[in-house]
Amino acid sequence: SRVGHPSDKIINEERLYSKVNGWTLSGAIDRQEINNDVLTIVDYKVTSAWSVIFGKPEWENQLNCYAYLCKQKYLNTNIKVGSLKICAILRDWNRREAERKEDYPQAPIVFVNITLWDDDKLDSYISRRISEHQDAQVNYDIDGSFPLCTNDERWRKKNSWAVKKVKLKRALKVFGDEASALIFQKEYQKHRLHENDRTEIEFRGGEYTRCQGNYCSV
């Protein structure tokens, strides 16, 4: 059997802290795997298959923040961050979809490799985000207001144009631009079966998946 390296170990559920520009950055890391002084950071997520297929930018941001915290923790050791992974537990995994599509996750639990940033990008991101929160705190102290989160942070859906039959809610087809919707509507009207089978175009403004009304989950 192989003799393990002195630093080899697994650390589960550890919360780390680091001071950045006078503020405390904190993160709870699900799993740290150290092998031959190389650290793999693993985060567990219950998510959808589509999140794995299309990816989520916030995963990359989150795990690189964990990488920053680990780099501070192991600063005076030989241990270096080597890789970042998401262990995705897919609540909606479908065996039939996996058999039909190569790009569909092939198991209900999969590992997703996350890009590890270089030190310059990582330090810049951490510094910028801390600065943004500090500025927001100053504004709140002055006039009681916070800046709004960005559309990406609020998971805003894109605007769409739905071609639908008059008085019916269900769309015949939904488009990402008005011009395409108009072309489809024109072609549909040419081949309609009944004189009263009229259509209309309904504009659907992009909604926020997060932060509906006065609710904020952050």
Regions found by a protein language model. Name each.
Residues 46-58, 109-112:
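Short helix/strand-bridging catalytic loops that position acidic/His residues to coordinate divalent metals
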Residues 58-69:
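Short, charged, amphipathic alpha-helix that recurs within catalytic cores of restriction-modification
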Residues 21, 68-218:
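Metal-dependent nuclease catalytic regions and adjoining charged, substrate-binding loops involved
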Residues 17, 47-49, 89-93:
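Short, solvent-exposed loop/turn segments at secondary-structure junctions
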Residues 42:
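Conserved beta3 VAIK motif of the Hanks protein kinase fold
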Residues 1-39, 50, 54, 99-103:
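Metal-dependent nuclease catalytic cores that hydrolyze phosphodiester bonds in DNA/RNA
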